[in-house]
Amino acid sequence: MTSDSFLAPHIPVLLDEVIEALSPVEGGIYIDGTFGAGGYSRAILEKADTQVIAFDRDPDAIREGASLVEKYKGRLRLVNDCFSNIGHHLDALDIKTVDGMVFDIGVSSMQIDRPERGFSIQADGPLDMRMAQAGLSAEEFLNNAQEKDIADVLYLYGEERQSRRVARAIVAARPLTTTFQLAKVIRQSLGYRPFDKKDPAAHCFQAIRIHLNRELDELKDGLQTAERFLKTKGCLAVVTFHSLEDRIVKHFMREHAGQTGQVSRHQPVIPQQNPVFFSKPARPVRAGETELARNPRARSATLRAVYRTETPFSEDISRPDTHIPRSRRQSA
């Protein structure tokens, strides 16, 4: 994508709903934790005379976003880093609070649509899958890891119940160097047929990508940052695309809004002892038929939003653990 093409409108999923939740105000400061092609940042900047600090660990996104920085002179700052490090950068800028944050979790359309990045099962390319284009690649991991470690990744992050079978097939097929090679091995190991409804390669690719990029750990850290920096009534809006991410976000928002629930519906609710940092979460929002017709990738998207309460942030306060849920026991 060239700098000129980057200026062309890019509409991320649930854009109207995200902007409605954020409700940008004049003079506000907003964080776009996952800049990508700049769709959310652009919409925030167009909605009101605001400032946006946008983060992306992918150097391609930062480089190609330079045209937006030029267009919105002095109002958009791009940072080549993970959104888990937002706090470090805000501290360096001496910014104490912000008016809103948006996180669009997972791989971007830009990354999927470029075969050379190795994220897609639809086009052949090198086994890469690194968002930051640094660190361990998918090729290095799959060709060197123990079979058990590969199986664990597929099971935990792809919820693949036949993960051991797939891992055995991957080890037997080494060396693997391309996305088509890997997809073929996965499909053959699970007896996939072209007319089957779901392609098992999709969630196995997802699992490997999540592992390599530490996506769930990054998500947990980013959510904690929002608690610290959002001002009273500031919005945290998070868009997720699969159940692992969504469960983490849902649990975080409920627990930090004081909704710890109860062990059984027949037992009384235990009074909440921890401070309440967020309002009661709104109902999750999903794409309507009009958006789905325009962008089929929005089908799995879920938006959750909460608003910061007046409770002061303190490092000394004990907080609920935003755990990564484990799936049921796998079969061989």
Swiss-Prot record:
Keyword Electron transport assigned: no
GO cellular component: cytoplasm
Main subcellular localisation: cytoplasm
Tree of life domain: Bacteria
Keywords assigned by UniProt, alphabetized: Cytoplasm, Methyltransferase, rRNA processing, S-adenosyl-L-methionine, Transferase
Chain intervals for the UniProt region annotation (Disordered): 309-332
Compartmental location: Cytoplasm
Gene3D superfamilies associated with the record: Putative methyltransferase TM0872, insert domain, Vaccinia Virus protein VP39
Binding of S-adenosyl-L-methionine, residues: 38-40, 56, 83, 104, 111
Reaction(s) this enzyme catalyzes, per UniProt: cytidine(1402) in 16S rRNA + S-adenosyl-L-methionine = N(4)-methylcytidine(1402) in 16S rRNA + S-adenosyl-L-homocysteine + H(+)
GO biological process: rRNA base methylation
Protein role: Specifically methylates the N4 position of cytidine in position 1402 (C1402) of 16S rRNA.
Similarity comment: Belongs to the methyltransferase superfamily. RsmH family.
HAMAP family associated with the record: 16SrRNA_methyltr_H (MF_01007)
PANTHER family documented for this protein: 12S RRNA N4-METHYLCYTIDINE METHYLTRANSFERASE (PTHR11265:SF0), S-ADENOSYL-METHYLTRANSFERASE MRAW (PTHR11265)
Protein name: Ribosomal RNA small subunit methyltransferase H
Organism field: Zymomonas mobilis subsp. mobilis (strain ATCC 31821 / ZM4 / CP4)
Protein encoded by which gene: rsmH
